[in-house]
Amino acid sequence: MPVRQLPETVVNRIAAGEVVERPASVVKELVENAIDAGATRIDVFTDGGGRRRIGVTDDGAGMAKGDLALAVDRHATSKLDDEDLLGIRTLGFRGEALPSIGAVARLCITTREAREPHAWSLTVEGGRKSEIIPAALTNGTRVEVGDLFYATPARLKFLKTDRTEAEAIREVVRRLAMARPDIGFTLAGEERAPVTWTAALPGAAGRLTRLGDILGGDFRAAAIPVRAEREGVIVEGFAAAPSLTRANALGQYLFVNGRPVRDKLILGAVRAAYSDYLPRDRHPVAALFVTADPREVDANVHPAKTEVRFRNAGLVRALIVHALKEGLAREGRRTAANRDGAVLTAFRPAPSPRPANWDWRESPAAPADARPWIGGPPAAAFAEAGQAALDVGAPSADVRFDAHPPLDLVDRPLGAARTQIHETYIVSQTRDGLIVVDQHAAHERIVYERLKTALARDGVQRQILLIPDIVELDEATVEKLIDRATELEKFGLAIESFGPGAVAVRETPSLLGKINAAALLRDLAEHMTEWEETLPLERRLMHVAATMACHGSVRAGRILKPEEMNALLREMEATPNSGQCNHGRPTYVELKLDDIEKLFGRR
């Protein structure tokens, strides 16, 4: 077959395959055009998941009659100066969206510029343009797309259900609404109830309001402001505390110069910043906005414009990690506080079942305050109970009291230890409430931070075992451990092969004290199996530190003396990120006195 020039209609349909993948792609292009036109309000309507109809109306600048005729031609745009691909400041710039949509659907554009006496309307069906005719519309533009892919019916079979396509449209509008909180958005359609996001005030407060409206109240309550700037690059936004996570990375919203993007570099930086806070199977929630000189960012990577390249990618990654780590460290203790009512909900008593005609006066026992104390006043009774609980030899001791904690400790952030319950949780009293601490989770974070500090300095001090521990493992596990022996030695864990299926442990980290070497090695080997070969050395070392910290921490079930409990609280106050353990779980919860009084109906 000889080489020949393809007809314009075929060329447009081929181009549409890159720009218009599904109805959500159409909505994205049209809403971006509205934003570039300076709109302050954008209304989106869909029907049939966008297959039957898509409508986008804005109050932007609109177009004159002559511009409307050119707007549906390929590579015709008002957003790009000649040869200025490096200084792109708009969301659109390729001049492909409208002709691509018109090539595969029925497209109708009605627009009016402020100086025009009336609006103008143009229809494009399957790439064929109609005459421009007068129409009625206030300032702005209305674009209607019907029968999407009617000109290329083979594409229809690749679309999902109406509900799935409608959800994809919703996600596109959500991202664009997050990028521009100063613009009001409405999203309506037969598949959903209308959603309206009113324009927010400028600044961080307005941005958080819009993010909270879209991502929900749990994100608003857990949001930590982050900001960093270096060499003309600004990273700002909000990141959720480690207590709010997702099972996937879909809760991470990234914007570069106002453009929603999916960038592996930024996603990797977010994950790295949270590596000390979250378990491996959980992902953070964040909305980050990167602002840089357009000449330092290449937005012309793909026709869909969802990918970007940075001239100095290392700077951007480092800045994101720094901003997030600084924000997380600054708000470290806030992650464990009672901000969303979860603690109050857990404490609320369930109503006791009682007969309808129940009367307390006919109850076998009188109210507590109507009965005399037997054996002394309440203080004496509690003192005796506390003394019995502090007796380590008592086999049934389940609650340990310190009836008279030092008064000055009550004013400390984590208060004075009052009791240990179930040999797992420390209850402390503060000036305005109480705190419940998970002793293992808290000590795990302390040990982890100590290991990190020691590693950054002169290395972890080690203790030589008089008699090496011989740990029997399968040969594959032994091989994994020996291959990583150099990395383990950095943490004071010296191992060597001891014949087939065994490892000799000759030195252990002093910080961990006496440990179960066999259990530690098995856990380390299991985690090493999950490591990717490309995982950076620093990340691998942090995984080792986290595993060691877990094995070297105070276990649940260990009875603590009052002075030990207070010492743990003081160490928590001096330890960075002490609000959550290495797995992202809270180390303590706080209940304010006001909340306690509400529980008992005093407020």
Swiss-Prot record:
GO BP term, pick one: mismatch repair
A molecular function (GO) term: mismatched DNA binding
One GO cellular component, as annotated: mismatch repair complex
InterPro entries cross-referenced by the UniProt entry: DNA_mismatch_repair_CS, DNA_mismatch_repair_MutL, DNA_mismatch_S5_2-like, HATPase_C_sf, MutL/Mlh/PMS, MutL/Mlh/Pms-like, MutL_C, MutL_C_dimsub
SUPFAM superfamilies per record: ATPase domain of HSP90 chaperone/DNA topoisomerase II/histidine kinase (SSF55874), DNA mismatch repair protein MutL (SSF118116), Ribosomal protein S5 domain 2-like (SSF54211)
UniProt keyword list: DNA damage, DNA repair
HAMAP family: DNA_mis_repair (MF_00149)
Similarity comment: family membership: Belongs to the DNA mismatch repair MutL/HexB family.
Task performed by this protein: This protein is involved in the repair of mismatches in DNA. It is required for dam-dependent methyl-directed DNA mismatch repair. May act as a 'molecular matchmaker', a protein that promotes the formation of a stable complex between two or more DNA-binding proteins in an ATP-dependent manner without itself being part of a final effector complex.
Protein name per UniProt: DNA mismatch repair protein MutL
Annotated source species: Nitrobacter winogradskyi (strain ATCC 25391 / DSM 10237 / CIP 104748 / NCIMB 11846 / Nb-255)
